[in-house]
Design a protein with these regions (language model features):
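Signature of Gram-negative outer-membrane beta-barrel scaffolds
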Residues: 468, 472, 493-631, 656, ...
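Acidic/polar loop-and-plug regions of large Gram-negative outer-membrane beta-barrel proteins
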Residues: 299-355, 381-470, 534-552, 702-705
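C-terminal beta-signal and adjacent terminal beta-strands/loops
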Residues: 696-697, 741-742, 810-827, 853-924
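Outer-membrane beta-barrel signature, preferentially recognizing the C-terminal barrel domain
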Residues: 331-356, 612-621, 625, 633, ...
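Gram-negative outer-membrane beta-barrel transporters
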Residues: 693-695, 716-821, 919-923
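Surface-exposed extracellular loop regions of Gram-negative outer-membrane beta-barrel proteins
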Residues: 312, 316-321, 539-549, 592-603, ...
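Short strand-turn segments of transmembrane beta-barrel domains in outer membranes
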Residues: 203-206, 218-252, 264-266, 270-278, ...
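Short acidic/polar hinge/loop motifs at secondary-structure boundaries
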Residues: 62, 134-135, 141-145, 172-203, ...
Length: 924
């Protein structure tokens, strides 16, 4: 027996670097295409415990297994994990027939995605004495729940902001270098070609990068990975868009080595049937990909994708406004013009991405190197109303609300009669409830003006705009490069490493969008004109081009470029031992940022034009972790990491629209994270329980607002912010019977500020620091996510390829985003203590239903239907977010000074009531 085990160990070692075929038939194939699945990992537990990387067949290895009962787990990137039980008798073949792996379903919940069917699942394990069926998905049950079920409440995994998660496309980082936020919308609608994904949580090793404290997700769009197919899709919904049409074609890898793939999608909705009025949607999406297999070791691919989109935006408002209109889904951005609804806030973007990739894999499959060059370009604009020397056009402006005359007014001047009049107007007059577009046009057309410069020279005569629509642009140009290598020098050792570089230039400027019946805009700094009326130079937006008269399509107001670059080198080593997988990793990242001004401002002639100083950061990351296999079904896992992370451009520079000043002594964030997990992988039960702790220090935050007490637009820079993220999460799938599966997920967190950070306040029209102190946040809760979330669901899988499911969900302990102004010494001294306490949003409960059906018309031709109904109980009173306004109402004290009186009301948004999504797909 010892001799046999020795022979087996040697054979497994050989197999781990690519075992030759003995039968000519691959052991593991794709369930749809029938092609061999590359890089399949198998974990063997029984009398012999071993992990190995299969070649295309390993029957000769499995035939050498000693007598006994074994658990075999097969996994491959982009596929569901398959776990089987094998009873091996002495001196007999394994009896293991060809296995089919099923590609991951998009989303992982069977709701918005297509049901994938394997026709012969029931026959895969013929010849085995103890057959166990396929586990439903290799995706983590908790991540599946948090990615879809919890998203209705804007759940953020472990309380992390988007900047602590990393989104990649073919190995290229796609998080915005200016803000840190992810960029899913760049390929919105391209569901069919973005399904292949590699996901890692909490620094777990992946081939494409070092990892981050949150979730790393790499989307792969390699054309040769798509099975040969045509795919037609139609979707209908009452969410943001009403209809979606899509067509996808993939050739598969042809005999001549070429692979082609293409996809086009159309998403449309006029806002009439969307859940919130004014949320119209008009979007195209496209993808083109070609790949050539140069030889057995090298392939080259070129892809291009984009998603030109135009959509109406809804904004949060106060509960007073919702109550006045009788709906928690009121949109303050809209009003009627010519009998049609018009939205003042519109997002328009089209940022195509072109990528050239080279793939190398040696004949032994022990070395893989992927290299990608990427270029991103295009336009991204966000429209907004602008006005000067005219009444505020926003319907929910605080002076137009009944509360302005009562609780928001000086106690000595409250007017209940005026409040009653405004309440009645809100309920009866649509021109009060919504933006009065006709009135804006009327005002502009009546404003015949002659504009003169300081010397009396006439600049323009005509209808000067008092109201207008401006488009705020953030147009990015980014070149990026990344390479990663995966090397298997030994059967027990796997080394991954790589390098990447990104250089981003983002043009930030305002553009005249719609003059609303006027002829021109006089481009001056309106706040400077108010504050320095006697000095015309101060109000100049650009001293190099003074007294500009601008019209539709012209740049005005501000114009600068944010320049950022980052390069990183990283390496991981993973050790595959008999019952232990362990890894260590290290990374070094260098980041640089500077501002390039294209205007010489009258207020800041010396530090607004040209290049600023370059601010640089050098950051280190280290990580380690281990997974211990108790037996073939139960595992213990731990991960620990320390990471430094540079601040983003938007949090580094103070008022970059006007000058190149940045925060004093900027620091990188310091992130420490540790977690411990128990994982179970039984044929009938799959899941994990994790306890985690993360401490983030030296975070920086920048914000701007109108300070009523100083009657000026001001900037708040908060430095040294520390947060603590402590909690536990669990997710399980239980196969109750061959046709019934239960799933459950639970997140319990305590996400709090760990210190009282410092702040400085500056006035936008000067470099003067008007206030400097600390903010009392320690022990208060981090906002933006439910800190308690739970779901319990059942799914029935019928023998005729349909499934039906229900999920019951609970969300609690969600807090509004806190204003720092209230919690300073000044705020705590002047304001009532009740305003200092953080506001907790209402807890809530929702129920979701979903169903799917797949009909095989002929071999290789499928018609699939999906229907999802969310919040079937129509709970319309569950807030999913909110923020305290930064402005504070002031009153005049007896000594004539302005005294803080009470904060403006919190603005809230709500979970939609009952919504549906229907999807049908024809694949052939």
């Amino acid at each position: 027996m010892n001799k046999l085990i020795t022979v087996l160990a040697c054979t497994l070692t050989f197999a781990s670097v690519g075992l030759g075929q003995t039968t000519g038939e691959p052991l593991v194939i794709d369930s749809q295409s029938g092609k061999p699945v590359a890089k399949v990992h198998v974990s063997i537990y029984g009398p012999v415990a071993k992990k190995m990387l299969l070649g295309q067949d390993a029957r000769s290895v499995l035939a050498l297994l000693p007598k006994g009962r074994y658990t075999l787990t097969f996994s491959a990137e982009g596929y569901e994990t398959k776990q089987i039980e094998l009873v091996k008798q002495e001196n007999e073949a394994s009896g293991l027939k060809q296995l089919k792996l099923v590609a991951l379903r998009e989303g992982g919940n069977g709701r918005y995605d297509d049901l994938i069917v394997s026709e012969e699942d029931g026959n895969e394990a013929a010849g085995m004495q103890d057959r166990v069926t396929l586990l439903t998905s290799s995706r983590d049950p908790f991540l599946s729940a948090s990615g879809y079920v919890f998203s209705t409440a804007r759940f953020r995994n472990r309380g992390y902001d988007s900047q602590y998660n990393e989104q990649m496309l073919n190995g290229i980082g796609m998080n915005d270098l200016n803000s840190g936020y992810s960029a899913w919308s760049l390929w919105g609608g391209l569901n069919d070609v973005t399904r292949q994904q590699e996901t890692s949580q909490s620094f777990e090793p992946i081939v494409s990068g070092f990892g981050v404290v949150g979730v790393t997700n790499n989307v792969t769009t390699r054309p040769s990975m798509f099975g040969a197919q045509h795919r037609l899709t139609y979707s209908n919904s009452n969410l943001t868009y009403s209809n979606r049409f899509a067509y996808t074609y993939a050739s598969g890898e042809r005999k001549d080595g070429w692979s082609f793939a293409a996809s086009v999608a159309r998403r449309i909705g006029n806002g009439q049937y969307s859940y919130v009025r004014g949320q119209y949607y008009d979007a195209w999406s496209y993808f083109l990909g070609v790949e050539k297999k140069l030889d057995e070791m090298n392939s080259l691919s070129l892809i291009a994708l984009g998603a030109p989109t135009r959509r109406g935006v809804a904004s949060a408002t106060t509960q007073e406004v919702y109550d006045l209109v009788g709906s928690n889904f009121y949109n303050p951005n809209i009003g009627r013009q010519g009998g049609k609804w018009r939205n003042a806030r519109e997002r328009r973007n089209h940022e195509p991405i072109v990528q050239l990739s080279h793939y190398f894999s040696n004949l032994e499959k022990t070395l893989n190197i992927n290299t990608t060059f990427s270029y991103r370009f295009g336009k991204n604009a966000y429209s907004s109303l602008n006005w000067y020397n005219a009444p505020d056009p926003r319907a929910d402006y605080y002076r137009y609300l009944p509360s302005y005359f009562t609780r928001m007014a000086d106690p000595n001047s409250q007017d209940g009669d005026a409040a009653a009049i405004y309440e009645e107007l809100w309920k009866s007059d649509p021109n009060v409830r919504y933006i009065n577009w006709d009135r804006l046009y009327e005002v502009n057309r009546g404003n015949l003006t002659t504009v003169k410069d300081a010397s009396g020279r006439t600049l323009a005569t005509g209808r000067k705009a008092l109201y207008m629509i401006e488009d705020r642009h953030t147009d990015q140009r980014e070149f990026a490069w990344a390479t990663s290598a995966n090397w298997l020098p030994k059967s027990w050792l796997e080394i991954t490493g790589g390098a990447n570089f990104r250089h981003n230039r983002t043009a930030n400027y305002a553009e005249v969008g719609d003059l609303l019946g006027a002829d021109f805009v006089y481009d001056i700094d309106k706040f400077a004109e108010r504050d320095f009326g006697g000095d015309a130079t101060k109000s100049q937006v650009d001293l190099l081009h003074p007294d500009r008269i601008v019209q539709k399509g012209d740049r005005f107001s501000y114009d600068y470029t944010a320049q950022s670059y980052r390069y990183q080198v990283w390496a991981n080593a993973t050790y595959h031992l008999t019952r232990l997988d362990a890894y260590t990793g290290i990374s070094y990242t260098h980041t640089g940022m500077q501002r390039e001004g294209h205007q010489k401002r009258g207020l800041f002639p010396d530090n607004s034009y040209g290049l600023s100083d370059r601010v640089k950061f050098n950051d280190l990351g280290v990580k380690a972790g281990a997974t211990y296999e108790l037996n073939g079904h139960h595992y213990l896992q731990t991960n620990v990491a320390y990471l430094e992370q540079a601040p983003t451009f938007q949090n580094l520079f103070i008022s970059p629209r006007t000058r190149d000043s940045y925060i004093e002594a900027p620091k990188s964030e310091k992130i420490f994270s540790a977690e411990a997990s128990y994982l179970v992988r039984l044929p009938w039960l799959r899941g994990r329980v994790t306890a985690f702790y993360t401490h983030i220090a030296d975070h920086t935050r920048s914000m701007s607002f109108y300070d009523d007490s100083r009657a000026s637009f001001s900037n708040y820079i908060i430095t040294g912010i520390a947060t603590r993220h402590l909690g536990a999460e669990a997710g399980f799938e239980v196969k109750i019977s061959p046709t019934l599966t239960a799933n459950a997920a639970l997140a319990l967190g305590q996400y709090q500020y760990a210190n009282n950070p410092s702040y400085i306040q500056s006035i936008d029209n000067s470099n003067e620091i008007v206030d400097r102190d600390r903010i009392y946040w320690k022990g208060l809760n981090v906002s933006g996510t439910p800190q308690t979330a739970a779901t319990l669901g059942l799914t029935y899988y019928s023998p005729w390829y349909a499934n039906f499911g229900i999920n019951a969900n609970y969300f609690g302990r969600n807090f509004v985003s806190m204003s720092p102004v209230i919690r300073t010494d000044r705020g705590r001294t002047s304001l009532d203590y009740n305003y200092i306490l953080p506001e907790q949003l209402r807890d809530g409960f929702t129920v979701d239903l979903f169903a799917s059906y797949s009909w095989r018309i002929t071999y290789g031709t499928y018609l699939r239907f999906n229907l999802s109904v969310s919040n079937v109980l129509n709970n319309r009173s569950l807030p999913n977010g909110g923020y305290e306004q930064l402005r504070i109402r002031t009153i005049r004290a007896t000594d004539g000074t302005q005294q803080l009186y009470r904060p403006f009301d919190t603005k809230l948004s709500y979970v939609y009531g009952t919504t549906f999504f229907f999807n049908t797909t024809l694949q052939f």
